[in-house]
């Protein structure tokens, strides 16, 4: 697992170069492997089948990595990178970023897979995601999720299926409602409201926010009402930039 730490401009440049080299190398390798597999498979079939698939990489920068309203980098910058493969509605991918928790945890890597598609005017997505952390103990966890969307709205339900940090945490859920405003031009505006529930009368966290985007840039305002940790978080305002390849 790679660790990307935010420290100084030279360190950031080194991390960017390392992430780009890693993702480009992995992408090239997977493309070659997939092409060879398709050639061998078509040679063994009487009727060749055309496989529609894609492999894409991404790298992102933000002055604050915020997840469900909570900073994951102690209000510091983050560099992230990911790789996604999709074919016929099925998809799988991985994503990594630096983090900064109270212990020695300093990096996060996610692995996910699922199936997404459309049924008329309704979109849907069902999948599984595992969150893994290096440098700390008992923080890994995984969720299953289902999402439906229509007319600019999307509703996503996530359910915790496994967690190293709490043996009794199986009832944790997160419900998110998002809305993409129908704007013309290059700008986009989306609204978000989420509820994090630990299946008790007190352990509930809500977060809400707004994101303004243009091209590869986005500006997000995020506020959380946090009962998990019995404190009130200040509004988070952060800028993000992402590129794909």
PLM feature spans:
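Outer-membrane beta-barrel proteins
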Residues: 2-245
């Amino acid at each position: 697992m790679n660790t990307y730490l935010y420290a100084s401009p030279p360190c950031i440049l080194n991390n960017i170069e390392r992430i780009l080299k890693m993702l480009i190398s992995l992408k090239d390798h997977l493309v070659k492997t997939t092409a060879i597999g398709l050639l061998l498979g078509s040679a063994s079939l009487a009727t060749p089948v055309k496989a529609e698939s894609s492999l894409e990489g991404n790298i992102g920068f933000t002055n604050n990595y915020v997840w469900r309203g909570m900073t994951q980098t102690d209000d510091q910058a983050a560099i992230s990178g990911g790789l996604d493969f999709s074919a016929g509605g099925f998809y799988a991918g991985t994503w990594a970023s630096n983090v900064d928790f109270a212990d020695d945890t300093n990096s996060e890597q996610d692995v996910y897979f699922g199936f997404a598609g459309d049924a008329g005017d309704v979109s849907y997505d069902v999948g599984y995601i595992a969150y893994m952390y290096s440098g700390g103990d008992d923080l890994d966890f995984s969720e299953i999720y289902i999402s439906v969307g229509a007319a600019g709205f999307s509703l996503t339900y996530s359910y915790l299926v496994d967690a190293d940090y709490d043996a009794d945490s199986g009832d944790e859920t997160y419900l998110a409602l998002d809305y993409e405003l129908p704007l013309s031009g290059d700008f986009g505006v989306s609204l978000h409201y989420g509820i994090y529930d630990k299946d008790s009368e007190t352990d509930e966290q809500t977060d809400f926010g707004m994101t303004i985007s243009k091209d590869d840039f986005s500006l997000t305002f995020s506020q959380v009402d946090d009962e998990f940790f019995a404190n009130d978080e200040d509004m988070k305002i952060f800028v993000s930039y992402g590129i794909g390849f």
